[in-house]
Amino acid sequence: MSQTIPQLEETEDGSLTLYTPRFGEHYHSTHGAVQESAHIYLGLGLRQRLEQWTEPEGAALRCFEVGFGTGLNALLSWREAERSHRLIHYYSIERYPIPAELYRQLHYELSTAIPLSTAGGAVPSCEEALASAELAANLGTQGTKEVGSSTSSAPLGRLEDSHSALMRLHEAAWDEDVTLSRYFVLHKISGDLNALPFPAALDLVYYDAFSPESQPELWREELFAQLRRCCRPGAILTTYCAKGEVRRRLERSGFSVERLPGPPGKREVLRATAR
């Protein structure tokens, strides 16, 4: 086996991640791939942005993901687009796409309704992990809305079989718009983040690159400043990385940054809002 081909591993919530020898890191938290993505990107990012959304009906929310990876963030976002009946134009850049023989083994069971809490402190299942997105969407918000209450508290139902949906995401053509449903348009970008122009007029950014230790070139202040110029005022950026220097670089680049509680295994994460 090539030393650069990622290896499948099961995480504590039962969902799969990959370990990459190239960078010596996992694609997701080993405490739970689904619960990490649901908490940081769906809850603190997409659902928060949708709550603030005041654009006319039919206007697309433009999301940019740094690191397509396993496609889990895209899958959750597609599912949320169908649930909310909001059009999402989803851009995702990836320099090292995973091979077909590997992504065909991925499976995320996301089709059942979601309980709002996990009793007894047990490690949540994939379905229960998504409930953290309900809670995360309320973190750091103003007003008296009760934690756990949400416009998304109804059962989410099926997008379609989650495995076939994931395969459609991976098999979609690169470097062009691909309409996957009435509410979800995917545009995968093949290449290096430092060498390509960013999409314009962004409303939401999932900054999910490997760590600053593994990919320091993707955490430079100059890159954040370029990204800020491509964001609309009020755009939200979320990332698992809560390092102080990353926070300061984002702030100097034109974002207001807050630390928020992270998913299991992660004390804090960052959410930045374009000033």
Predicted segments with their positions:
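Conserved beta-strand signature within the Rossmann-like core of class I S-adenosyl-L-methionine
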Residues: 234-241
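S-adenosyl-L-methionine
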Residues: 106-121, 125-138, 152-196
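Rossmann-like AdoMet
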Residues: 1-61, 78-112
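Glycine-rich SAM-binding Motif I of class I
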Residues: 71-75
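A short acidic, Gly/Pro-enriched loop at the edge of an enzyme's catalytic core
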Residues: 195-204
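A short glycine-rich, Lys/Arg-flanked "PGG" loop and its adjoining helix->strand segment in the class I
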Residues: 220-233
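Class I SAM-dependent methyltransferase core
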Residues: 63-65
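Class I S-adenosyl-L-methionine
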Residues: 243-275
